[in-house]
């Protein structure tokens, strides 16, 4: 039985991906900062483990407890929404620690077993803001664009060992907690000079008429990356992301 470890399974894309792989007969290691086993159906093929991707000890313990893996999905992330002038450097570092360095650290932790076995897949979930930049998201976009570049380079690095690395690039989804955690970090404290721009951005978010991304779109893209060796290295997920990638 194949085993997948997914970070950030408390909601949204990670939770839906865990459900899909469970339904399709995989062993799933669903991780989150504070484990809640009731989020997923009881199964002998499910392990719900605590994981903080910014903590080296937490990573080591979780990877050891998970056992042999076939696929790693780096999905854990935090949002940050504000004008650059309104951000503290502490907030910016927190976003990079989770979104960028957390992804790198998790990948580094599982690579030895993949390389030694000559097989394995790494799937990094980023964001369509790397395809179509938006205001008030400069630091968040940078953290995700760094993961794109990391993954693209890593994919070449791992070819000699039979290990694959892929990007799944979701569009905007109301099914994620991005807005909630982004506004928490923003503190709703947009500098006065950017007030009008912020109002326009929030209004555009609320009035969007384009087709958005569903969590199931992302889960299916992760499934394809995990199971289809012929799939592209970059996979936009969701109608909006697909359209932006083609533009």
Which residues are covered by each model-predicted region?
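Active-site helix of classical SDR
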Residues: 107, 143
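The beta1-alpha1 cofactor-binding region of Rossmann-like NAD(H)/NADP(H)-dependent oxidoreductases
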Residues: 50-61, 89-90
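SDR active-site lid
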Residues: 160-231
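Residue(s) in the substrate-gating loop at a strand-loop-helix junction
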Residues: 127
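Substrate-binding pocket helix/loop in short-chain dehydrogenase/reductase
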Residues: 83-84, 91-93
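N-terminal Rossmann NAD(P)H-binding glycine-rich loop of SDR-like oxidoreductase domains
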Residues: 10, 14, 18
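Active-site loop immediately N-terminal to the catalytic Tyr-X3-Lys motif
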Residues: 85, 132-138
């Amino acid at each position: 039985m194949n085993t997948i470890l997914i970070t950030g399974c408390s909601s949204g894309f990670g939770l839906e991906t865990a459900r899909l792989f469970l339904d399709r007969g995989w062993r799933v290691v669903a991780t989150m900062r504070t484990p809640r086993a009731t989020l997923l159906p009881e199964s002998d093929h499910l392990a719900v483990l605590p994981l903080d991707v910014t903590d080296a000890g937490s990573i080591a313990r979780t990877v050891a407890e998970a056992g042999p893996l076939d696929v790693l999905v780096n999905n854990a992330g935090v949002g940050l929404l504000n004008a650059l002038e309104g951000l503290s450097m502490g907030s910016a570092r927190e976003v990079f620690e989770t979104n960028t360095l957390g992804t790198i650290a998790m990948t580094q932790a599982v690579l030895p077993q993949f390389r030694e076995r000559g097989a394995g897949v790494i799937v990094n979930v980023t964001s369509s803001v790397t395809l179509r930049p938006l205001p008030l998201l400069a630091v968040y976009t940078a953290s995700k664009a760094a993961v794109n570049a990391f993954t693209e380079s890593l994919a070449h690095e791992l070819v000699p060992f039979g290990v694959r690395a892929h990007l799944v690039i979701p569009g905007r989804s109301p099914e994620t907690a991005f807005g909630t955690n982004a506004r928490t970090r923003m503190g709703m404290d947009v500098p006065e000079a950017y007030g009008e721009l912020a109002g326009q951005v929030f209004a555009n978010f609320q009035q969007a008429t384009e087709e958005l991304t569903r969590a199931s779109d992302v889960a299916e893209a992760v499934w394809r990356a995990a199971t289809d060796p012929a799939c592209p290295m970059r996979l936009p997920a969701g109608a909006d992301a697909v359209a932006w990638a083609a533009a």
